[in-house]
């Protein structure tokens, strides 16, 4: 049973990494068009990826994972703009 759980966790880890590899450039470009400072855009990207990680159970079943990530980035950009 423990081995199966470990294998499932490893599969989830690999799937999450694949999703991020496939979408990181898209997300960064999306953010960079709205936040011109590269350092701040990287911060927003990292916050977006952190939320994706925290919500992985929801995200892995989502029918439009890229859309989920972009919407998350959009909300993080709004948060950023409220602070400035």
PLM features per residue range, with description:
Residues 2-3, 77:
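Short, low-complexity, intrinsically disordered N-terminal modules
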Residues 3-29, 33, 42:
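A short, charge-rich alpha-helical start-of-domain segment used by transcription regulators
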Residues 9, 49-64, 83-84:
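Sigma70-family region 2
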Residues 29, 43-50, 63-75:
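Structural recognition of an alpha-helix C-terminal capping motif at a helix-to-coil junction
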Residues 74-84:
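Arg/Lys-rich amphipathic alpha helix in sigma70-family domain 2
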């Amino acid at each position: 049973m423990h081995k199966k759980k470990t294998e499932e966790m490893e599969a989830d880890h690999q799937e999450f990494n694949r999703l991020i590899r496939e979408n990181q450039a898209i997300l960064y470009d999306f953010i960079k068009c709205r936040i011109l400072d590269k350092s701040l855009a990287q911060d927003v990207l990292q916050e977006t990826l952190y939320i994706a990680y925290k919500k992985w159970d929801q995200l892995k079943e989502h029918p439009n994972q890229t859309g989920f990530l972009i919407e998350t980035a959009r909300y993080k950009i709004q948060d950023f703009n409220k602070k400035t």
